[in-house]
Amino acid sequence: MIKLGIVMDPIASINIKKDSSFAMMLEAQRRGYEIHYMEMNDLHLEQGVALADTKVVELKEDPSGWYQFKSEQTIALSELDAILMRKDPPFDTEYIYATYILERAEDEGVLVVNKPQSLRDCNEKLFTAWFPELTPITMVTRKAEKIKAFREQHGDVILKPLDGMGGASIFRVKEGDPNLSVIIETLTNHGQNYCMAQTFVPDISNGDKRILVVDGEPMPYCLARIPAKGETRGNLAAGGRGEPRPLSETDKKIALAVAPTLKEKGLLFVGLDVIGDKLTEINVTSPTCIREIEAAYDISITGKLMDAIERRLKATAM
């Protein structure tokens, strides 16, 4: 029996209709795995050994009570076969410390999904810089005058922090916007923080597409997140609506261009954000949208993920 750990946000407050971590656990349970639930504060290190206070959990597809803890124990993480790191951003120093603890478990033979070092290396906004031919024109800086010059040159632009999620603090700035200076001050914390400027992609009205890539294989369907009327952000958390769709030829091309790098870096489950024909983000921490896509199409994305985990476990056991 496979022992699977999962580090996530509190299970009591998830929305099971939309939660991808819940979908992953349901599939693992269907396969007979023993599931060890953990939150960040359950992880600890002693003399270089990674440990955790875990709760073995059973799940049900029931909005009135979707989980039950069966037992509580403190274990060495090396007792687990695999661990899903599914903690949502913010990607802060606490998150980074947790990846070091998980890396100690990885050193002892545990498969950690996604790979802890790659979680640190591949910032969701900045990692697109390794694929400049696929992205909108992009600049990352702390300097207000550079952002203003970028806006001057490109007209309609998007400004965003490097550490947000769910569309938080994303601004669209057009010519003559009287708020440009205060937006820059807010995003850069008066020149103390980097922020990203990108040319605006008008195709956002047709949706910000979330494309899932499992172990280097793009899934054939995506979730297009359509902005609410008068909005420029498609994020569901910002009021957008999700529309499952098959991948277009352009979507496939973008996903296949990025996929080999993801696989090589041990990023088994990744969400690409694509607007029109431009890659805008590479989400590696806790990508979502599984539930919406699986509800619309005859596909088990979680099944493909567990297959990939089992393949890797078999390969290391040989």
Curated annotation (Swiss-Prot):
Keywords: ATP-binding, Glutathione biosynthesis, Ligase, Magnesium, Manganese, Metal-binding, Nucleotide-binding. ATP binds at residues 150-207. Pathway: Sulfur metabolism; glutathione biosynthesis; glutathione from L-cysteine and L-glutamate: step 2/2. Binds 1 Mg(2+) or Mn(2+) ion per subunit. Pfam families: GSH-S_ATP, GSH-S_N. It catalyses: gamma-L-glutamyl-L-cysteine + glycine + ATP = glutathione + ADP + phosphate + H(+). This is Glutathione synthetase. It comes from Vibrio cholerae serotype O1 (strain ATCC 39315 / El Tor Inaba N16961). The gene is gshB.
